[in-house]
């Protein structure tokens, strides 16, 4: 087991055996323990009472946080050439048709998000094995299959992103950076929690949230009381 540094031991001591019922206090500790020499990503880990192997217990949706997550993403658009100008003017970083499909098939993926128009989806189907594991396959549910490229690109450029529960029913998602203000992190986390809550799968029975933790890239896990947002 890797030996903990003095800083890590001190940070863990601050959160050991604590469950925070006050959001302001939790965010304060979160920022106090973000002591790495780089700007750390801030994450929520929500353990949900779901079994994603059942279709009615799957969680996959999009959200736009009030203050973004502090990340600029590269967006590629797959469409026919009649839409190239619109996509470029709307801010797409890469626009293509069959040429883009060929690049992807060769493993040349230089984008963080892929948006496609419906007419291109049959051609894209063969790349499911390449894009699927990376979470890059466009889908109507995530808003990445669209006929309104200008509006869709605007939303994602403003910080809209997709998140989903993993096979164990846990959502791992960023809600900002350690250099965000206290209020920005509080507002982002609250908005993210509400999004997860509002998209509760229809097949969930009983309690939805099992546990909630927040942390920074190098910081300790901070457990939140399940009633903290009430």
Swiss-Prot record:
The keyword RNA-binding applies. Gene3D superfamilies: 3.30.190.20, 3.40.50.790. GO terms for cellular component: chloroplast; large ribosomal subunit. InterPro entries: Ribosom_uL1_bac-type, Ribosomal_uL1, Ribosomal_uL1-like, Ribosomal_uL1/biogenesis, Ribosomal_uL1_3-a/b-sand, Ribosomal_uL1_CS. GO terms for molecular function: rRNA binding; structural constituent of ribosome. Part of the 50S ribosomal subunit. Belongs to the universal ribosomal protein uL1 family. This is Large ribosomal subunit protein uL1c. It comes from Trieres chinensis. The lineage of its organism: Eukaryota, Sar, Stramenopiles, Ochrophyta, Bacillariophyta. The gene is rpl1.
């Amino acid at each position: 087991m890797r030996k903990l540094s003095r800083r890590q031991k001190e940070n863990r001591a601050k959160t050991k055996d604590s469950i925070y019922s006050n959001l302001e206090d939790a965010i304060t500790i979160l920022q106090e323990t973000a002591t790495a020499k780089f700007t750390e990503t801030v994450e929520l880990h929500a353990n949900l009472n779901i079994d994603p192997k059942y279709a009615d217990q799957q969680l996959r949706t999009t959200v736009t946080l009030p203050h973004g997550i502090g990340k600029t993403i590269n967006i590629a658009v797959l469409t026919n050439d009649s839409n190239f100008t619109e996509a470029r003017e709307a801010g797409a970083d890469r626009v293509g048709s069959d040429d883009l499909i060929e690049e992807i098939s060769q493993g040349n993926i230089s984008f963080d998000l892929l948006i496609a128009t419906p007419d291109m989806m049959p051609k894209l189907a063969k790349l499911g094995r390449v894009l699927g594991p990376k979470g890059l396959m466009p889908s109507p549910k995530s808003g990445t299959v669209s006929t309104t490229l200008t509006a869709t690109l605007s939303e994602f450029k403003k910080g809209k992103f997709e998140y989903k529960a993993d096979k164990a029913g846990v959502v791992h998602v960023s809600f900002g950076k350690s250099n965000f203000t206290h209020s920005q992190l509080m507002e982002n986390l609250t908005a993210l929690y509400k999004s997860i809550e509002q998209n509760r799968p229809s097949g969930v029975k009983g309690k939805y949230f099992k546990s909630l933790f927040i942390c920074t890239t190098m910081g300790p896990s901070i457990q939140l009381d399940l009633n903290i947002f009430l």
